[in-house]
UniProtKB/Swiss-Prot annotation:
An example Gene Ontology molecular-function term: manganese ion transmembrane transporter activity
Name the UniProt record assigns to this protein: Divalent metal transporter 1
One cellular-component annotation, GO: vacuolar membrane
Additional comment: Culture supplementation with Fe(2+) rescues the growth defects in parasites with partial gene knockout.
Organism listed in the record: Plasmodium yoelii
Length: 696
């Protein structure tokens, strides 16, 4: 019990040159005192259980610390969290510390921006080191608990935003500190404990315990700022692999079965001039649209850098920012629309999975669909187990997919001169305008930007300053560029594989799909190639399915600020998708193409719901501050946003009008188009009023 007085004296002497002071609580010597020390984010709390007395010490301001200890003044909660003078930037690891009830303390936005989230007062460290708190870690049963604490301290991810939502907000939208702690000792990182008696109605999604699976041990930050610019190549490589994850998961969206189906159809495009000529004449029309894939991935890279910066700087994902800025009704509307886009992509992913199962094992399609339910259990296990494990599994599946499709390209004689000509000299084959627009529209989907911002929000720098933010942005840019480069090459390989197929006019079908593409592979490349194609398709479907599940989780929590059991969420969505697919397959498995085309149209229409808020937040200084895009790049992105919206809108409009059964249908499409454009204009002009960025 004398340790509390020692600590107060240690901090007191740092202020008053060694002079002692009176105690806040005169009953400290009682054995029934319940002492809890919370050592994180410059915060200590001592609670007297008898008198229910609480004294808070916020070490972000040394004067406030001493005055609080002396009892000279009660500082308000708002004053404490808005204090700007830091105590220390040192990142201590509390190894060999036991008999201290260490609790993780989630702080508000404003307090977090004041400096190192893992900094601690030197006086506090001295107190722990000098008062027999140290124990041999090997002799304690709390080894795992303290290692978890160390893991969090050294994490490259923000303790203020556990799972992306470590904040809370009042009715007027302003941030406040919910005083929630995750008790490390004896809670196995799962149990909830509200030691501050915070009212239940103030506790929302952010009030969840720390999940160590979201954190990695090796820190991306280099604490020694004097040596930070002289990092070795291996250190930089290590930092990259520590960051590794978000970009590769997002790249899955560019390699889903829907994109694969579009790629093979583009590769099998043949000019009308070659339809009736001898099959020995080579037709390179299938090469002509490679430029769409290349430039589409470049567009995706630009928007992914914006979503990546949004997560790093604000610690919030795109969905959470929309919820905080817009009304609850509008947030619900956005959530429903984005969730529809996710379900559409998920349907295409499941189609690829059961088609691959049907090709590999010869199982009937209706039975192969059941595999998707097994896959749901696998995803639920991975999500509950560890996000890091999920990232590794997805990366493995991406590797399998890329290897399978690259193996096929070695079996085809690629004309690299035609490849270069297509990329450097963009042109559209005669009568293939809609195919071109459709391919461009399928490359970029709305939900991937929500997902990317969610993943990068977990990578927010623990040590928050301009240098660290720039480092994280650089790591994110490299990773996004590398993953999208691999995705672009893989998509081009699929196009080139089918572009090299010398199909005569008699063999050329109007449309190829995932069900009959294997006929082409088997006929022109052999049975082995067909199986390799099928395994690549299976990997693509599994990847995309897992990615859609996680995207669904992120938008649900971001827009609604609610949480639901992952098992029930996954099973519920899979049952709905299972019923829809089973109904389509029971009618005719080839009608899946019609469903896929309809999904592509929906994805195109919903894309503005992602790129508009992403652009708006990226240019606003209240959101990104000095990191907001400006100058020529700002106007370039604006032109790209408008061009994508207009191009996709015209594509959809022409597609609908092409099959208009009556004049009444045309009128309906025309009126709907007007409302759609008015909504886009309204969305573009919605104000952004709150501030999320604060100078470090």
């Amino acid at each position: 019990m004398h340790q509390d007085n020692s600590m107060r004296r240690a901090i007191n002497q740092s202020r008053n040159g060694g002079s002692d002071s009176c105690d806040i609580n005169n009953d400290r010597e009682h054995d029934n005192i319940n002492r809890n020390s919370y050592i994180n984010n410059f915060h200590i709390e001592n609670i007297n259980s008898d008198k229910n007395e609480q004294s808070y010490i916020y070490c972000s301001d040394r004067a406030q610390v001493t005055d609080s200890i002396l009892g000279n003044r009660k500082y308000t909660h708002e004053e404490n969290i808005n204090s700007t003078e830091m105590f220390s930037r040192t990142n201590y690891e509390y190894s060999n510390k036991n008999n201290v009830d260490i609790e993780m303390y989630n702080i508000s936005n404003n307090n977090f921006y004041n400096g190192n989230n893992n900094g601690h007062s030197n006086d506090i460290i001295d107190y722990i080191n000098n008062n027999n708190v140290n124990k041999d870690l090997s002799n304690t049963s709390n080894n795992a608990d303290i290692n978890t604490y160390i893991k969090k301290l050294t994490s490259n991810q923000s303790t203020a935003y556990c799972d992306g939502k470590g904040y809370n907000e009042s009715a007027n939208g302003s941030n406040f500190d919910i005083n929630f702690r995750d008790v490390i000792k004896n809670n196995n990182n799962k149990n909830y404990k509200n030691n501050n008696h915070v009212p239940d109605d103030m506790l929302e999604l952010g009030d969840r315990s720390f999940d160590s699976s979201f954190y990695i041990h090796n820190n991306v930050e280099e604490i020694d700022t004097e040596r930070s610019n002289r990092l070795s190549f291996m250190s930089k490589l290590k930092m990259y692999f520590n960051y590794f994850g978000p970009g590769w998961i997002v790249a899955i969206a560019y390699l889903d079965p829907g994109n694969i189906c579009g790629n093979l159809n583009v590769g099998l495009i043949r000019s009308d001039d070659f339809i009736n000529v001898n099959s020995s004449v080579k037709d390179y029309t299938g090469y002509r649209l490679l430029w769409v894939l290349v430039y589409g991935h470049i567009l995706g890279f630009i928007f992914h850098t914006l979503s990546m910066k949004l997560g790093h700087i604000t610690g919030l994902d795109l969905a959470a920012l929309c919820r905080k800025e817009f009304s609850s009704k509008f947030s619900y509307f956005l959530y429903i629309c984005v969730q529809i886009a996710i379900w559409g992509a998920h349907l295409q992913a499941i189609i690829g999975v059961f088609v691959a199962i049907n090709l590999i094992l010869g199982i009937p399609v209706k039975i192969a669909i059941l595999y998707t339910l097994i896959e749901a259990f696998a995803y639920s296990f991975l999500e509950n187990k560890s996000l890091d494990l999920l990232e590794k599994v997805l990366s493995l599946l991406i590797g399998i997919l890329v290897c399978c499709f690259m193996f096929n390209v070695f079996m085809t004689p690629i004309n690299f001169q035609e490849v270069a000509s297509s990329i450097l000299y963009p042109r559209i084959p005669k009568g293939k305008l809609l195919d071109t627009m459709g391919l461009l529209g399928s490359v970029i989907s709305a939900h991937i930007f929500y997902l990317h911002s969610n993943l990068t929000s977990k990578k927010k720098p623990v040590i928050y300053n301009d240098r660290m933010v720039k480092r994280y942005n650089k790591l994110g840019t490299i990773e996004s560029g590398g993953s999208l480069l691999v995705s672009c090459i893989t998509n081009c390989i699929i196009v080139l594989t089918f572009a090299e197929v010398n199909i005569s006019g008699d063999d050329r079908k109007a449309d190829y799909n995932l069900f009959n593409a294997y006929d082409v592979m088997k006929k022109y490349f052999g049975k082995t190639s067909m199986y390799i194609w099928s395994f690549g398709l299976l990997s693509s479907g599994n990847n995309a399915s897992f990615m859609c599940e996680y995207a669904s989780k992120s938008v649900f929590e971001g827009f609604l600020n609610k949480n639901v059991n992952p098992f029930f969420r996954v099973i519920f969505s899979r049952i709905i998708l299972f019923i829809m697919l089973y109904a389509y397959v029971s009618y005719d498995k080839y009608t899946i193409d019609q469903l896929s085309n309809f999904i592509n149209v929906v994805q195109i229409l919903l894309l503005p719901l992602a790129i508009i808020p992403l652009y708006r937040f990226s240019i606003h200084k209240n959101v990104l501050g000095k990191f907001a895009i400006k100058g020529a790049f700002k106007y370039l992105v604006f032109v790209l946003v408008i061009s994508i919206i207009v191009a996709n809108f015209l594509l959809t409009l022409f597609d609908f009008l092409q099959y208009a059964p009556s004049n009444l249908y045309v009128i309906f499409i025309f009126i709907s188009s007007i409302f759609y454009l008015l909504f886009i204009i309204y969305f573009f002009n919605m104000p952004i009023t709150k501030t999320y960025y604060k100078d470090s």
